[in-house]
Amino acid sequence: MDKGRCTILNSEELWAQARQLFAGGVNSPVRAAVKPFPFYVERGKGAYIYTVEGNKFIDYVLGYGPLILGHSPESVKRKIIEQLEKGWLFGTPSKLEIELAKKISSHIPSAQKIRFVNSGTEATMAAIRLARGYSKRSKILKFSGNYHGAHDYTLVEAGSAATEYNVTTSDGIPMEIMKTVEICEFNDLDCVDKKLRNEDIAAALLEPIMGNAGVILPEKGFLSGLRELTKSYNSLLIFDEVITGFRIDIGGAQSYYQIYPDITTLGKIIGGGFPIGAVAGKAEIIDNFTPAGRVFNAGTFNANPISMIAGIATIEELEKEYPYNIANKASKTLVEELERLLKIKHTINHIGSMFQVFFGIDKVRNYSDAKRANKEYYIKFHERLLKERVFIPPSQYETIFTSAAHEDDVVNDTIDKLAKVIGELS
């Protein structure tokens, strides 16, 4: 193929090629939810992404969460370039992994020790194996609509793109594995009590704030009750903070709610936009990973220098606090304006720099509620915003994110476009 020709193809032409090369035309299913075909992005800067055609979009997807500083922040880019000059993979430890681990441990209260991996999926997979190895129990309790990555142990009643494409329980997972996963609804402590009572649950695994069924918040007493129940029945508590870690608070949702798990999984923001995952927790638990213990985990790219330096540089910016002030203000303003503009039945779940709007329903407290929202209206809302060059997630079951690059001028421009779209839909 003529590489020069490829650079001038438009999105429709690229989509035609992609469908010949990839299952469904994409390499992660939610990307195909943009209709009639995905637009292809060439670059990003600040709050904006730019397509191969040169169209400029205000971006509220932000790579599905990692880009809390916006696209290509200079402070992070500079350090990545410096590291690229030195090398990007050595097959040995580097001092960068120590620096990033210290950063994480200084902010995440429960992170006494850490194992770096390459994605949120790898992190939850390793965390489940670790919990089983440590507890000598085989079952896991998860919550409907929580999404913990694309592996067998959690693709049961899963949210995110699994819900979008109606494969909440994936084909290809042996029944024997499914039988090791118990399910409760989010915010349902009675169910948790019943499931844990048999004392065969290694760990309860959840997103402390659901970010993969829209945004769904824990009700008062839910996380504290869950912590008490897991302790009472000698089960571990795993917080999947791949989305919420370093976004809700520099210490994650656990710091925000003051509820501390035994194990935390991290990803997204701690890699500054590069592939990363981490399993963090109490030293006595994490020390069960090889080579200290007998729970095997390994990876060629674990703690690769580029992800490490990008994470360090990102957290250094977050320590200055201004990113949270800007991102949270942007989110709050957008939610307030949406509430003012929307005249139809709806609810907006919002915390920090993440929110989602649900149409046709006045309360969403769990996955069952989220599925009752008017998905078709949300799709129209998304499509009309695309025409105005505003990019929100194409799926109802994802999160709208803001960043430190969403300054007042960006937000005000967005509000004008929201007013136009909502007026057209009314």
UniProtKB/Swiss-Prot annotation:
Its EC number is 5.4.3.8. The modification N6-(pyridoxal phosphate)lysine is found at residue 268. It is found in: Cytoplasm. It comes from the Archaea. Keywords: Cytoplasm, Isomerase, Porphyrin biosynthesis, Pyridoxal phosphate. PROSITE patterns: AA_TRANSFER_CLASS_3. Its main location: cytoplasm. This is Glutamate-1-semialdehyde 2,1-aminomutase. It comes from Saccharolobus islandicus (strain L.S.2.15 / Lassen #1) (Sulfolobus islandicus). It catalyses: (S)-4-amino-5-oxopentanoate = 5-aminolevulinate. Its cofactor is pyridoxal 5'-phosphate. One of its GO terms (molecular function) is pyridoxal phosphate binding. Pathway: Porphyrin-containing compound metabolism; protoporphyrin-IX biosynthesis; 5-aminolevulinate from L-glutamyl-tRNA(Glu): step 2/2. NCBIfam families: hemL (TIGR00713), PRK00062.1 (NF000818). Belongs to the class-III pyridoxal-phosphate-dependent aminotransferase family. HemL subfamily. InterPro entries: 4pyrrol_synth_GluAld_NH2Trfase, Aminotrans_3, Aminotrans_3_PPA_site, PyrdxlP-dep_Trfase, PyrdxlP-dep_Trfase_major, PyrdxlP-dep_Trfase_small. GO terms for biological process: protoporphyrinogen IX biosynthetic process. The keyword Nucleotide-binding does not apply. One of its GO terms (cellular component) is cytoplasm.
